[in-house]
């Protein structure tokens, strides 16, 4: 699985091979997740400034949806070490984030600030 930005200058920092993910410690995994969520927040902030119909908005929405698709898939795995109740809450939040991103893509919402706030709270909770 690869999580990457379309910005070639930043791609290496946010691209993770499946082998790297398998070989890392839980602390390392949390740091990678934190970096990816940081990047999603940056993209959402840029999109908020540029507007919902901008190239920045398209990039942010695609990145956020891909990131949360990956995170939800990981959270749903039985071998995930997080407590079941926390996993369920994070999946619920992730689904909300993906729905909000889809509404922005469909131009029925411009709720970048809500996505930024929730993403910031999730990022700050990663340890």
Give the predicted meaning of each segment.
Residues 2-66, 76-77, 87-127:
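N-terminal intrinsically disordered, cationic/polar leader segments
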């Amino acid at each position: 699985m690869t999580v990457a930005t379309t910005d070639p200058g930043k791609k290496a920092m946010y691209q993770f091979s499946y082998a790297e993910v398998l070989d890392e410690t839980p602390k390392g995994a949390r740091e990678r997740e934190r970096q990816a969520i940081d990047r999603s927040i940056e993209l959402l902030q840029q999109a908020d400034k540029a507007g919902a119909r901008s190239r920045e908005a398209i990039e942010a929405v695609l990145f956020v949806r891909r990131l949360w698709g990956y995170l939800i898939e990981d959270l749903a795995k039985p071998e995930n070490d997080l407590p079941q109740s926390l996993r369920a809450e994070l999946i619920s939040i992730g689904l909300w984030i993906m729905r909000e991103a889809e509404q922005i893509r469909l131009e029925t919402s411009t709720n970048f600030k809500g996505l930024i706030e929730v993403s910031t709270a999730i990022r700050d909770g990663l340890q």
